[in-house]
Every structure is written in C-alpha cells, then in structure tokens.
Amino acid sequence: MVKTILIPTDGSDYGKTAIDYGIYIAKKLAAQLIGLHVVDVGLMQGPVFSDISGSIGLPPYQEFLPVIEAGLNERAEAILKAFRERCEAAELYPEARKAIGIIDESIIEAGKKTDWILLAQRGEHFHLTKGSILGSTAELVVRKSGKPVMVTPATYQDIESMALAYDGSPPADNALKLAVSLSEKAAWPLTIICITGDQAVADKLHKKIEAYLEPFQIDCETIMIRGQEDREIMKFIREGSVELLVMGAYGHNRLRELLVGSTTSDVIRKSKIPVLLTR
C-alpha cells in the first residue's frame, strides 16, 4: 500500500516532530523513509541583500555568493545527518537527499516518485510565507501534489485511532478508501464524521458509507453532526478522542474558497493532530 514516504526537513522543531511521526508510521506500514532538504534558491539569489549591499557600499553580492552557498550546503548536510541519525536510532535506515530550488516545487517534484509526503504544519520560514491566499508550504504541497500528504503539528503523540471527515465529494471518497485501507493495515479504529444540517443529505451519506464498508472487517463507527464544517472538525479534534484525521482536500472550487474560506486550509493551520489529506 505505502512503500515510500517523503519527509521534507528543515531542522526546525516542527520538522523534528514530522520525522518522529514518519518513523512511527514507517514502522506501522513497513515503509521506506526518504528525507529531503531543499536549499531555497531564493536565499542563494538574494535580491534583497544585493540591493542593500549596493546602497551602503559593500562589495557586490556576487563576491559573497560562494560563501553563502557553502554555508547553505553545510547546513543542509548537517540537517540530513541529523535526520539519518534520528531514524537509525529507531532502527530505520532511510535515504537522504538534497535539492536546490523553490521549496514547494522541489517537494512536489520529489514526491512524484513516492507514495506519501509527510511534512510539518510550519517550517523554518513560517512567518515569511507568501500570504493568506497562497498559504504555507504545507498548503501549497497539498493543493498541487497528486499524492496523499500528511501535515503534522508541533507536538508528537502515538496514533492509536483515527477519524475521517466525510462529505460525499470525490476527494472525500478517495479519503474514505485511504482511511479504510489504513485502518486495515495499522489496526486503527476509525470514526467517520459527517457534518450537515440536512437530514436527507445525512441519510444519503450514511447509506453511501455503509455500502462501501460492507466488504471490510474493520472497527468503524459513523457519527452525524450538525454545524459548520471547520468548527465542528476542530471541536472534534479538541475532544481528543483520535490522534489522526483523514480528509479530502479542497473539495470546493477556488471562488468559493476565496469568498468563504477553505475548510482544508483552516484545519491544516489549526489542527493539534496530524491531518492526512488526499485529492
């Protein structure tokens, strides 16, 4: 099912937690871990530094470039060494790779040859992200990657049970398949939550779920909840009854997201447990 998991790592505290989750899940699923550190090409090009150096009479930026490149490469090797050591301490022997480029694009490209991407909710440059519309690296990877993406929070806890947020959309159907497969493989009990104020819709969703689950022998329950999607999902997470949430990503169109916001983005940013997303 899941043979390879890509873990982008930047040495941040959030990134270290992502590695711990990767180790735990790799053992559960017998998967190979691949660590990736992306040297941000923006730091190497340094347009801001170039402008400043010229205006205050410092030597041209090009004279500093070899020193900057050497420092970034040295740091990359140290981060990947720490990744390998963390995995090897848990008796896992990962691959470790370095790339130079735009961070989200490099992650997506590397992820094409893996089954999952697992990355931190926030990275080293969280406060320097591109703004609320485009969002964080995690959101960009979820939106653009064709692979399941697990986004991990600040702190680690073992996963013993999981929930699926289900609304009947095509991404949610894919998430249902993924959640059931995971429940079988990892023996995690599954709670499916459907959030709607329409009883007819609730009945339709329940029948659809039951029909899909019929061939499977897993520990599963379905709960119908009235309310607003993002609020009820976050409330369910805060109750602490599960340690992993699975959901379909960006099930609505971009115009609706711009007007009323995206449940996916809201959950990615605020969740205190890992969120596994699929398109």
Where are these regions (language model features)?
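Small/aliphatic-rich secondary-structure junction motif
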Residues: 1-63, 144, 157-224, 242
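Gly/Ser-rich helix-loop-strand patches that form or flank binding pockets
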Residues: 15-17, 21, 27, 96, ...
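Aromatic/hydrophobic pocket-lining residues that form π-stacking "cages" and hydrophobic walls in ligand
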Residues: 18, 22, 83, 107, ...
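A short acidic, glycine-rich active-site loop
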Residues: 58-75
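Ordered, amphipathic secondary-structure segments that act as subunit-interaction surfaces
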Residues: 72-82, 86-92
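A short helix-to-beta-strand connector/capping loop
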Residues: 87-98, 214-221
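Short acidic loop-to-helix transition motifs that present clustered carboxylates
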Residues: 101-104, 227-231
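A short, acidic, amphipathic alpha-helical segment used as a generic capping/interface helix at domain edges
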Residues: 210, 228-238
